[in-house]
Amino acid sequence: MAKSPVRIAVTGAAGQIAYALVFRIASGALLGPDQPVILHLLDLPQMQGALGGVMMELEDCAFPLLAGMVATDDPKVAFKDIDIGFLVGARPRGKGMERKDLLGANAEIFTVQGRALNEVAKRSARVLVVGNPANTNAYIAMKSAPDLSPDCFSAMIRLDHNRAASMLAAKAGVNVGDVGKLIVWGNHSPTMYPDYRFAEAGGRKLAEAINDEAWNRDVFIPTVGKRGAAVIEARGASSAASAANAAIDQVRDWVVGSDGRWVSMAIPSDGSYGIPEGIMFGVPVTTQGGVVTRVPNLAIDAFAQSRLDITLNELKEEREAIAHLLA
């Protein structure tokens, strides 16, 4: 018997990340080869023409799983009865724009979208925020949707996780698909902390195999943290395909399950690891049946604690900068 279609919203749907995302969703890369989807595509009024072109291309792919599309500039239409949301659209940082101005501009966007989700989305919806600053944008959307469980919201830190896994695999001479128990803690920003103290590949402890604290501190952590800037420098544009891929990875694991593997997700803190409750913070989790379970009781040494403090302080500053907008 055919499955009922899953409704999936994508915001910023005429943008570059969405262009790398929607075709993969429609092909079955997110939910598998037998799950039909209906795409709800949201973008600004002035982007509706370009969005129409994206929809023409989606039609021309003749995806058997694409059961329908909705194009709109109204969040309440876009989020009506959705099962999954990818909040990709965000205000980019303009020339001369201060970080607090960027936070304020995005607070307006994600307050409106959070309220719309609160009003019309399914109560079981899973909403991933991709648009930067992703952790704080997700926090704003969550706070603006008080009738939805905080567990409905996550921010994307999987791109950092994938970047770290690729770099670790190259350093250790292993297949990236074999790397497990890697963690990315904190904010999706250069302050995040990629932590391979527990990482394994093929039964080997990677920290023992690499055994190079200077490389960890001076090469690995800063390179992962600045990878997005390096892509912009080389490509002349920000990461789009890799961001879309990470969004698919994170939501697929969230909805379908991680099969016992540790994955990194930025989720509202429950107070564990000394992170104040409610802050959207990257932590190691396992997922099954849409339920996220934090990996508990991991040892935090002095260096790890110092890195957690750096990224936590940044998130606290971001939260304080937009607190008056949520009052």
UniProtKB/Swiss-Prot annotation:
GO molecular function annotations of the record: L-malate dehydrogenase (NAD+) activity
Superkingdom field: Bacteria
Keyword Cell inner membrane: no
Residues that, per the record, bind NAD(+): 12-18, 106, 113, 130-132
InterPro entries noted in UniProt: L-lactate/malate_DH, Lactate/malate_DH_C, Lactate/malate_DH_N, Lactate_DH/Glyco_Ohase_4_C, Malate_DH_type2, NAD(P)-bd_dom_sf
Reaction(s) this enzyme catalyzes, per UniProt: (S)-malate + NAD(+) = oxaloacetate + NADH + H(+)
Protein's GO biological process: malate metabolic process; tricarboxylic acid cycle
Pfam family membership, one: Ldh_1_N
Database matches in PANTHER family: MALATE DEHYDROGENASE
Function: Catalyzes the reversible oxidation of malate to oxaloacetate.
Family to which the UniProt record says this protein belongs: Belongs to the LDH/MDH superfamily. MDH type 2 family.
Protein name in the entry: Malate dehydrogenase
Source organism of the structure: Acidiphilium cryptum (strain JF-5)
Gene: mdh
